[in-house]
Each structure stands twice: as C-alpha cells, then as structure tokens.
Amino acid sequence: MTPDVRNLLRHLRVPGLAYRDFGAAAPGSIRRTQQRQGLVTVGLVSLVAGVGRTALCANLVRAFAQQGTRAGAIDVDPQGTLTAMFGAEGRDPSTCIEHLALERDVLLVDTGSPPPTDVLSEADELLVVARPDAASVAAVGQMEDLLVRTRMRSWRKPRARWLINAFDGRRRADREALAAMRRALRPRVLATVVQEDRALHDAFLARRLVHDVAPGSQVVADLDALARELHWGRGSERHAWVD
C-alpha cells in the first residue's frame, strides 16, 4: 500500500478505510482492476445534490467493516467533498486503485450530481441515493432514463438500487414520498431506510464517523442493517444480478 494511503488509515484510525481522489484515469483503472482482482465497485449516485450521498459513502465503509467486508471509498466528485472532509490527495490513480483492489472486497465511489456517465458505466452496481421529498420523486423518471441508457451502452450492465436517506416517519410528506417511490420502483427500493438522525450530520461536519461518536444511534443501526442487506464481498455473485 502506498505511504499516503497508510497515513490516511492511521489518521482516521479505521482499519480498511481509504479515501482517494483521482481524475481521468479512474474508469480505465477500475475496469482493469475488476477484471484482474474481482473487486466489487459500487457507485453512489444522485441526480440532485444535498441528499446525503457523501456522508453515507463515508460511513458505509465502517458499516461494511462491522460485517467483515473489507471496504474502501474513493472520491470522483468534482467538488471533492469526501476528500476535503477526510483529507487525502492521490498521486497515481492507477497505482492507488490497484493497491485498493488487492486489499479490499468492495470499493465505494462517491460521485457528483448529476453522476458522470463513465462511472455509471464502469460500476458493478449503483446505489441511487434519494431523500423522501418532492424533488427526489420528481427526478425518478429522469434518473431511470439515465440508468437505462447506461445499461444499454455498458458491458457490465450495472444494477441500480435506490436508497432512501433522511426519512422521518413522523412527517406525512416523507411517508407519502416513500410510498410513491416504492410504487414506481419496487422492488429496486432497498428495504432498509436510513432514518433522519442529527448524529450523522454532526459526525460528518466533525470529520468523524458516526459509529465512533454515536454508536448507539438510530442511524448506526440503519447503516449496519443496510450493510447486511447489500451483502457485497469478494466472491459475491455479482455477474448474476438482474433487474
């Protein structure tokens, strides 16, 4: 593993956590690494900003570790939020991705909004992050069209599943939006819903993982349940996935 990745792991004190920022070489590097190593790459995408995608990406790495899955995360968002929050800068994208492949089962890729088509095409699976609100409901059709076009031109045929974040069951609008999305997208909406919890927001702003600062919180329970539902890992039957 390269020295700067080792330094990052020490800085975060989280075994198996690595954030890297890389540029144009990323899609080809991901493809070559997948072919050689069997790494499962997962793009976290959203059509609209502000849905909590980056915070989920960071904290899902720890949730996977709790399940025994060796996970890492990289940042391809032009805004570089993940990199800015957790502080790593890549020197050699191709070398970095290959090092991660040797030591990880799952690689989460944090993207921008709207997501870049190259990441959509090269991922093994896509997690579409959405909030239960009018903006996300209105964007369902547009995102679905984008996903269909992606599958048509991608040899990997990535499966897309929808993750609902920041849900508050006390709000009627949230309940109605969730019901509408499940009607439109079922069974592709994940059963696990990440409930709204201030602990996640506060931990992210503090550049910490929520498992460390609020281990008994609702959002930690939701993230752990999400990791169990997704169940990615080396040897998973990702080539048999169908919509």
Language-model features: locations:
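Extreme N-terminal, non-catalytic leader segments
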Residues: 2-46
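P-loop/Walker-type NTP enzyme "switch/lid" segment
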Residues: 45-51, 59-122, 141, 198-210
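Walker A/P-loop
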Residues: 54
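Well-ordered beta-strand positions
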Residues: 106, 124-128, 161, 187
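Conserved Switch II/interswitch segment of TRAFAC-class P-loop GTPases
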Residues: 123-144, 168-170, 174
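Conserved C-terminal guanine-recognition region of P-loop GTPase G domains, centered on the G4
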Residues: 140-156, 165
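Beta-strand-loop-alpha "switch" segments that mediate conformational coupling across diverse proteins
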Residues: 166-173, 178-211, 223
